[in-house]
Amino acid sequence: MSSSDNYRLDGKVALVTGAGRGIGAAIAVALGQRGAKVVVNYANSREAAEKVVDEIKSNGSDAISIQADVGDPDAVTKLMDQAVEHFGYLDIVSSNAGIVSFGHVKDVTPDEFDRVFRVNTRGQFFVAREAYRHLREGGRIILTSSNTASVKGVPRHAVYSGSKGAIDTFVRCLAIDCGDKKITVNAVAPGAIKTDMFLSVSREYIPNGETFTDEQVDECAAWLSPLNRVGLPVDVARVVSFLASDAAEWISGKIIGVDGGAFR
């Protein structure tokens, strides 16, 4: 086997949550490009998910879309069951579904707190639980944290950052729990990534961001990185693809920052 073969995913089956758009879609496509068959999970937009499926198929692999609300543990169990029923087994689970939230502590309601933690924290925990139950030995669980989780405090961002901070602890503990099946558990922690939500979300991070033009938002986000550019979904997808591969079999319990060195 050549060294490049260690990065291939031929014969593997991957499931990506929140894969209808943005980072999740890029992850699903990247895994497919490396040879994996892919389950594209989505919450609401079947049309968007089917476009991702079509792209994966056009690149020579196979894929299906399955709707599931990852905030509902029963729905997560059903999602994994359907994935195994369709493809026969499961090797990789990339948990990407999440929601963002901004608000000063004085304004945060219990409903908003619960809305964010239901998906970002509770949802990812039960995705990991069901991944452990469904993955073959030697599988991969890859969760999604954030560079605001433990590296840098952000005003009006406590609920979101806290919901992601829990993921860092999950990873360290679950890596131990999952060792008996030789399953590795890691997380990616993206910074600013240029998805369809990039401009609106980035303005929340920038003081007086509502007064910035789109070009100024781009420049500000790029300035944070010594590489002087904004992150792209494919930047995260490449790291997830590596963690999913045989080349990463000795990496577990780690949170990998994917922010171009923005917070250092």
From Swiss-Prot:
Active site: 145-146, 160, 164
Protein EC: 1.3.1.-
MF (Gene Ontology): versicolorin reductase activity
Enzyme class: oxidoreductase
Superkingdom field: Eukaryota
Observed phenotype of the null mutant: Impairs the production of sterigmatocystin and leads to the accumulation of versicolorin A.
Keyword Repeat part of the UniProt annotation: no
UniProt cross-references to SMART domains, sorted A to Z: PKS_KR
Up-regulation conditions: The genes forming the sterigmatocystin biosynthesis cluster are co-regulated and induced on oatmeal porridge or the fungal isolates were grown either on oatmeal porridge or in YEC medium (0.2% yeast extract, 5.0% corn steep liquor). Expression is positively regulated by the cluster-specific transcription factor aflR that binds the palindromic sequence 5'-TCG(N5)CGA-3'found in the promoter.
Keywords of the record: NADP, Oxidoreductase
Coiled-coil regions, chain positions: none
One Pfam family named in its UniProt record: adh_short_C2
Pathway where it operates: Mycotoxin biosynthesis; sterigmatocystin biosynthesis
Sites where the protein binds NADP(+): 23, 69, 96, 129, 160, 164, 193, 195
Gene3D superfamilies: NAD(P)-binding Rossmann-like Domain
One BP term from GO: sterigmatocystin biosynthetic process
Annotated CDD domains: THN_reductase-like_SDR_c
Residue ranges crossing the lipid bilayer per the database entry: none
InterPro entries associated with the record: NAD(P)-bd_dom_sf, Sc_DH/Rdtase_CS, SDR_fam
Function text: Versicolorin reductase; part of the gene cluster that mediates the biosynthesis of sterigmatocystin (ST), a polyketide-derived furanocoumarin which is part of the most toxic and carcinogenic compounds among the known mycotoxins. The first step in the biosynthesis of sterigmatocystin is the production of hexanoate by the fatty acid synthase (FAS) units stcJ and stcK. The polyketide backbone is assembled by the non-reducing polyketide synthase stcA by condensation of the starter hexanoyl-CoA and 7 malonyl-CoA extender units followed by cyclization and release of norsolorinic acid.
Name of protein: Versicolorin reductase stcU
Lineage: Eukaryota, Fungi, Dikarya, Ascomycota, Pezizomycotina
